[in-house]
């Protein structure tokens, strides 16, 4: 549930998972510490914030023998939302968001200049869905956290009553 509803309260998560609030709190903190939960974000509608044009830009270095530092060379370009290393004809695929075709053209020039690459661009026409969280069994994920260390459940009368 947290992967789908990041603002869910520990009380509601505990109710749905059949655990005590203190056990859920400990387990979620452990999942954060272990790197299973890597953060919480607010997803903004790109059109509402003035970035209606999404494109995927495949990049390939001109010099195949050059060091593979393309992600670092492009990190300063905030219009690049994601950078994926891929197998195939290109080395990386970038997901970019900009306000207009003119801004996309400018961004492509910046990418080419900063990284010494050729580009191939695909413009997104519509997005039926994105940012889909994986389907996870809440209890299984929380139990995984409990398996990684001690838990308050043993001493929690609410959980003891459920057994």
What are these regions (language model features)?
Residues 1-163:
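A compositional/biophysical signature of low hydrophobicity enriched in polar/charged and small residues
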């Amino acid at each position: 549930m947290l992967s789908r509803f990041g603002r869910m309260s520990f009380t509601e998560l505990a109710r749905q998972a059949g655990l005590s609030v203190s056990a859920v709190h400990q387990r979620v903190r452990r999942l954060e510490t272990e790197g299973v939960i890597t953060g919480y974000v607010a997803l903004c509608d790109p059109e509402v914030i003035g970035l209606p044009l999404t494109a995927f830009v495949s990049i390939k270095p001109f010099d195949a023998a050059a060091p593979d530092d393309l992600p670092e060379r492009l990190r300063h370009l905030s219009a690049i939302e994601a950078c994926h290393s891929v197998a195939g004809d290109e080395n990386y695929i970038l997901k970019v968001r900009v306000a207009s075709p003119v801004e996309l053209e400018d961004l492509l020039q910046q990418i080419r200049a900063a990284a010494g690459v050729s580009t191939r661009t695909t413009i997104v026409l519509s997005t039926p869905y994105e940012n889909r969280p994986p389907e996870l069994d809440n209890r299984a994920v929380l139990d995984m956290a409990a398996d990684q260390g001690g838990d308050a459940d043993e001493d929690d009368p609410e959980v003891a009553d459920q057994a």
